[in-house]
Amino acid sequence: MPELPEVEVVRRGLERWAAHRTVADVEVLHPRAVRRHVAGPDDFAHRLKDHRIGTPSRRGKYLWLPLEDTDQAVLAHLGMSGQLLVQPHETPAEKHLRIRVRFADALGTELRFVDQRTFGGLSLHDTSADGLPDVIAHIARDPLDPLFDDEAFHHALRRKRTTIKRALLDQSLISGVGNIYADEALWRARLHYERPTATLTRPRTTELLGHVRDVMNAALAVGGTSFDSLYVNVNGESGYFDRSLDAYGREGMPCRRCATPMRRRPWMNRSSYFCPKCQRPPRVTP
């Protein structure tokens, strides 16, 4: 599933190619793609028609397109395989094309939502005074947000009584961090994924947040992480941060710091990758 860097890459592409364009018509080709829009496909298409798309926004992994002169926005949920592509009109339809948005201008391109597994979708929602769709009001700010409160995050960690990787994936504490970037940041910080959050000092939390931001910015610089053709930017291009990963997916390969073979352990229906020497597991108290 795309994490913050991948979603931000898409947001930037939409800002360049779709923002400030007026919707001429919308074609919903698969009803599941708008299942979160409870009024149905026809209502979704009708409500977008003739509206101008504002500057795309993002919080964590959530991306939305505000409709100018309204208090509503189109929320994009990419799921496991969703893609927002800006394509020339004449480009043949993708096999898993679900929604097509045509614009009332002569630029010759349209916005397409393509989703192989149909776990994602688009939906229209009311927004708050600060432009946030109401359905994601509970989502915390992400670490690249200038208003993210490092001090409040540290205190929340200390109160949470959980482990550090669980906390990094808790969208009510910090958004945008998924399995890949959690493993990468923890490796950089030399923290084991099962380290209790109550044991983190303020300097350790500061260091960890610095690594989270560094790894995300590094991924952003190269278009995000693509392990297959399902994650692409709006022009259909893959990112290549997977070439720079230090932890994720490197089971059995030498740690880039100490050369100890990296390990993988099952974790919450996922996997955690770590160095057994650099990232010592917490001591178990009898």
Curated annotation (Swiss-Prot):
Its cofactor is Zn(2+). GO terms for biological process: base-excision repair. Binds 1 zinc ion per subunit. DNA binds at H96, R117, K160. It comes from the Bacteria. It catalyses: Hydrolysis of DNA containing ring-opened 7-methylguanine residues, releasing 2,6-diamino-4-hydroxy-5-(N-methyl)formamidopyrimidine; 2'-deoxyribonucleotide-(2'-deoxyribose 5'-phosphate)-2'-deoxyribonucleotide-DNA = a 3'-end 2'-deoxyribonucleotide-(2,3-dehydro-2,3-deoxyribose 5'-phosphate)-DNA + a 5'-end 5'-phospho-2'-deoxyribonucleoside-DNA + H(+). A zinc finger (FPG-type) spans 246-280. CDD domains: EcFpg-like_N. Keywords: DNA damage, DNA repair, DNA-binding, Glycosidase, Hydrolase, Lyase, Metal-binding, Multifunctional enzyme, Zinc, Zinc-finger. GO terms for molecular function: 8-oxo-7,8-dihydroguanine DNA N-glycosylase activity; class I DNA-(apurinic or apyrimidinic site) endonuclease activity; damaged DNA binding; DNA-(apurinic or apyrimidinic site) endonuclease activity; zinc ion binding. Its EC number is 3.2.2.23, 4.2.99.18. The active site is at P2 (schiff-base intermediate with dna), E3 (proton donor), K61 (proton donor), R270 (proton donor). Belongs to the FPG family. This is Formamidopyrimidine-DNA glycosylase.
